[in-house]
């Protein structure tokens, strides 16, 4: 699984995931499924904001070609991936500027068009189950929830999907591709099943020549969302950088 992640995700996303896991004492050699899940969630958050801007008239527009003369503002502020201190600083700044209610938990994005925070979810289970778990945790009607699955399903607060159909289809296609590539490598079953994950881990450790008695317990603790964001993500050219970074999984 680790090799798959390094092949299928942009190195910058992989690096952010590595730093986050290290910060919380998680070993990516052991928690390989969590490593893959964090990278996937990060990429979906970046893809969610990609191409979306607000023009001088305050209208939401989609721009795929950069025009240096255009006075555009990014529609979405990416909060996911920053360190906690910076993330809360950004959230507080947004709340002070827009009058938005401060969320209890750090959200993933802020939508300047709809003036609301957004929590993004990517699940290997039924979307409605994961949606309810998110809603019960957040306990706030002010934070918009949008859940994607690897099967192409999605669920959002009040069926308001925020993005246009084409943008959402791009995210769904990427998730479906990840699933298909995992399946072709025999990794999908272990990704969705803790029991199968343990079997795969033992197999991987054995193939790496590690002691058969090495600890194989997979943590059930949910990783905090990534809070480490490189300065480049703040740059005005981040959209072009991200667009170029979405790599297709190479075949075996």
Swiss-Prot record:
<dbReference type="GO" id="GO:0039694">
    <property type="term" value="P:viral RNA genome replication"/>
</dbReference>
<dbReference type="InterPro" id="IPR038372">
    <property type="entry name" value="PA/PA-X_sf"/>
</dbReference>
<feature type="active site">
    <location>
        <position position="80"/>
    </location>
</feature>
<feature type="active site">
    <location>
        <position position="108"/>
    </location>
</feature>
<dbReference type="GO" id="GO:0003723">
    <property type="term" value="F:RNA binding"/>
</dbReference>
<feature type="site" description="Important for efficient shutoff activity and nuclear localization">
    <location>
        <position position="198"/>
    </location>
</feature>
<feature type="site" description="Important for efficient shutoff activity">
    <location>
        <position position="206"/>
    </location>
</feature>
<feature type="site" description="Important for efficient shutoff activity">
    <location>
        <position position="202"/>
    </location>
</feature>
<dbReference type="InterPro" id="IPR001009">
    <property type="entry name" value="PA/PA-X"/>
</dbReference>
<feature type="site" description="Important for efficient shutoff activity">
    <location>
        <position position="65"/>
    </location>
</feature>
<dbReference type="GO" id="GO:0075523">
    <property type="term" value="P:viral translational frameshifting"/>
</dbReference>
<comment type="similarity">
    <text>Belongs to the influenza viruses PA-X family.</text>
</comment>
<keyword id="KW-1190">Host gene expression shutoff by virus</keyword>
<keyword id="KW-0945">Host-virus interaction</keyword>
<keyword id="KW-1192">Host mRNA suppression by virus</keyword>
<keyword id="KW-1048">Host nucleus</keyword>
<dbReference type="Pfam" id="PF00603">
    <property type="entry name" value="Flu_PA"/>
</dbReference>
<keyword id="KW-1035">Host cytoplasm</keyword>
<comment type="function">
    <text>Plays a major role in the shutoff of the host protein expression by cleaving mRNAs probably via an endonuclease activity. This host shutoff allows the virus to escape from the host antiviral response. Hijacks host RNA splicing machinery to selectively target host RNAs containing introns for destruction. This may explain the preferential degradation of RNAs that have undergone co- or post-transcriptional processing.</text>
</comment>
<feature type="site" description="Important for efficient shutoff activity and nuclear localization">
    <location>
        <position position="199"/>
    </location>
</feature>
<protein>
    <recommendedName>
        <fullName>Protein PA-X</fullName>
    </recommendedName>
</protein>
<feature type="site" description="Important for efficient shutoff activity">
    <location>
        <position position="28"/>
    </location>
</feature>
<feature type="site" description="Important for efficient shutoff activity and nuclear localization">
    <location>
        <position position="195"/>
    </location>
</feature>
<keyword id="KW-1262">Eukaryotic host gene expression shutoff by virus</keyword>
<keyword id="KW-1132">Decay of host mRNAs by virus</keyword>
<feature type="site" description="Important for efficient shutoff activity">
    <location>
        <position position="203"/>
    </location>
</feature>
